[in-house]
């Protein structure tokens, strides 16, 4: 969703504006297309998604991922000044909180069952 937001924000930008925003190399390789990568330019990979087949370990990993996503959305909110960007970020941040709480409930249930 963040890649889509960035794509929408740059769709009408000139090449000069992209260069001034530090997106010159991104434009060189990908134009204004969506290319999910982190702030250092490292592309997304499915290797980030891990599962070991143990419900407790997997749920803890899921909860950790939700908290990291929440923190990232908070960092993006701190940088944002456009209400059309802020509102979706607030929604996405809240979604991470809800996901974390659901994973936590399931984690607690598995622990109570002796896993």
Predicted regions and their residues:
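Non-heme di-metal
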Residues: 1-115
